């Protein structure tokens, strides 16, 4: 049984309590390598049904590459054992102004078609008793992006995770992204983008603070 860090457990429970963990079925009994083998076996069947020749040198290892990619590279955010180690620093400097990390690169996967979501996030918070190591914000964004997602939920998950870890509601998150389920199929719109915003605490209650955050997002 995997023992989660305190922060990972807190975040998981907060998301479950708020209906923001709709898919996770509990602890996976199969080991990682066993899951890879099963995914590869199913992928072979799919490729065969597509009339692809798995004896071809270029395709022979594709089922295994896809299995590895799903478990190790694209979807590690499904396992809270991979939640980033969090560094909190006591706010001895009494910082009480907005801290913002802009242009956080994220790559996620549309849960409806398993196609790419390619975007950037901006995260702001106003410190209370602790501040967080800046790179940890990027890592939290990446963790929740590395799972099948819809952008609206992803934005809310990042917000609630940071509120839980930092012990303050004063957090704001905005994500700007291109969805390849729109760009590469269906309507095939190659220019549209989607922006989602989730605001907490003073970012929601104070028009001035909200506008300051929105101006930060729009900076070039």
Curated annotation (Swiss-Prot):
SUPFAM superfamilies assigned: Tetrahydrobiopterin biosynthesis enzymes-like
Catalysed reactions listed for this entry: GTP + H2O = 7,8-dihydroneopterin 3'-triphosphate + formate + H(+)
GO terms of molecular function: GTP binding; GTP cyclohydrolase I activity; zinc ion binding
Recorded metabolic or biological pathway in which this protein acts: Cofactor biosynthesis; 7,8-dihydroneopterin triphosphate biosynthesis; 7,8-dihydroneopterin triphosphate from GTP: step 1/1
Top-rank lineage group of the source organism: Bacteria
First-level EC class: hydrolase
Keywords from the named record: GTP-binding, Hydrolase, Metal-binding, Nucleotide-binding, One-carbon metabolism, Zinc
GO CC aspect terms: cytoplasm
GO BP annotations, alphabetical order: one-carbon metabolic process; tetrahydrobiopterin biosynthetic process; tetrahydrofolate biosynthetic process
Alphabetical list of Pfam families matching this protein: GTP_cyclohydroI
Assembly and interaction partners: Toroid-shaped homodecamer, composed of two pentamers of five dimers.
Family per record: Belongs to the GTP cyclohydrolase I family.
The protein's name in its UniProt record: GTP cyclohydrolase 1
């Amino acid at each position: 049984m995997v023992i989660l860090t305190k922060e990972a457990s807190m975040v998981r429970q907060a998301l479950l309590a708020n209906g923001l963990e709709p898919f996770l079925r509990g602890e996976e009994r199969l080991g990682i390598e066993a899951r890879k083998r099963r995914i590869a076996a199913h992928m072979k069947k799919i490729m065969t049904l597509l009339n692809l020749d798995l004896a071809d040198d270029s395709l022979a290892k594709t089922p295994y590459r896809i299995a590895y990619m799903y478990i190790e590279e694209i979807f590690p955010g499904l396992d809270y054992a991979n939640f980033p180690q969090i560094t909190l620093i006591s706010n001895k400097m009494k910082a009480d102004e907005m801290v913002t990390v802009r242009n956080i690169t994220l790559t996620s996967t549309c849960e409806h078609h398993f196609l790419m979501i390619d975007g950037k996030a901006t995260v702001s918070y106003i410190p209370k008793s602790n501040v967080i190591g800046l790179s940890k914000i990027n890592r939290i964004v990446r963790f929740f992006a590395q799972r099948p997602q819809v952008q609206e939920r992803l934005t809310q998950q990042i917000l609630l995770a940071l509120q839980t870890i930092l012990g303050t509601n004063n957090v704001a998150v905005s994500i700007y992204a291109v969805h390849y389920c729109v760009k590469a199929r269906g309507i095939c719109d190659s220019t549209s983008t989607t922006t989602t915003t989730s605001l907490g605490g003073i970012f929601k209650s104070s028009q001035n603070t909200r506008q300051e955050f929105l101006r930060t997002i729009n900076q070039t």
